[in-house]
């Protein structure tokens, strides 16, 4: 699979038909999976040339996008593509898009590639001092654990349930912090 080299300046939230998964978003914004139908993802500006990308370069559900560069050990963080229906999506600058040859349960690989078991393999392969990077040739040397499809489904469902609970609790904490700030501003006048 092929990624592109478009910078943030080549992207727009207002214009464009082809979405772009940027490495910075893989590192910071997206979790173990990114729901293309619901996530805010920038598009490649319409005046940029995307004709060189074949249909196999466009991401599909179940594809994995690794961030190949970071300023810390976040390098190699991965996100799994889910919720893709009619959108066209390319993997962007400093990413490594991967398409599994076998069928995996939805979200299993997103969780697995961010697990300690997998990331400990990646850490040994990282290159660089100030900016860390990993290459496709190193990623293909890693080993993955492949339980039965049913077990993959159970693992992904359990972890997703925990993630959903964490998101709800985070929203509650943010609301309480906002309320507290408001009270502190108005109570002691």
Language-model regions: role of each:
Residues 32-35, 90, 110, 123-124:
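Short, charged, solvent-exposed linker or helix-capping segments at domain edges/interfaces
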Residues 1-36, 69:
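Low-complexity, Lys/Gly-biased intrinsically disordered segments
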Residues 2, 119-121, 127, 131, ...:
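Glutamine-centric residue-chemistry signal
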Residues 22-23, 39-114:
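A short beta-sheet element
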């Amino acid at each position: 699979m092929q990624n592109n080299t478009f910078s943030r300046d080549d992207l727009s939230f207002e214009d464009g038909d082809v979405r772009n998964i940027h490495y910075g978003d893989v590192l910071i914004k997206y979790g173990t999976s990114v729901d293309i139908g619901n996530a805010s993802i920038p598009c490649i500006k319409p005046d940029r040339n995307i004709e060189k990308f074949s249909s196999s370069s466009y991401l599909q559900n179940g594809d994995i996008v690794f961030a190949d560069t970071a300023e810390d050990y976040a390098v190699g963080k991965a996100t799994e593509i889910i919720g893709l229906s009619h959108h066209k999506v390319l993997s962007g600058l400093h990413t490594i898009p991967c398409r599994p040859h076998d069928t995996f349960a939805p979200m299993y690989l997103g969780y697995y590639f961010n697990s300690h078991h997998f990331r400990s393999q990646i850490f040994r392969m990282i290159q660089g001092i100030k900016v860390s990077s990993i290459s496709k040739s190193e990623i293909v040397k890693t080993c993955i654990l492949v339980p039965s499809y049913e077990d993959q489904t159970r693992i992904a469902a359990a972890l997703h349930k925990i993630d959903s609970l964490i998101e709800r609790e985070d929203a509650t904490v943010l609301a309480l912090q906002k309320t507290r700030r408001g009270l502190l501003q108005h109570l002691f006048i």
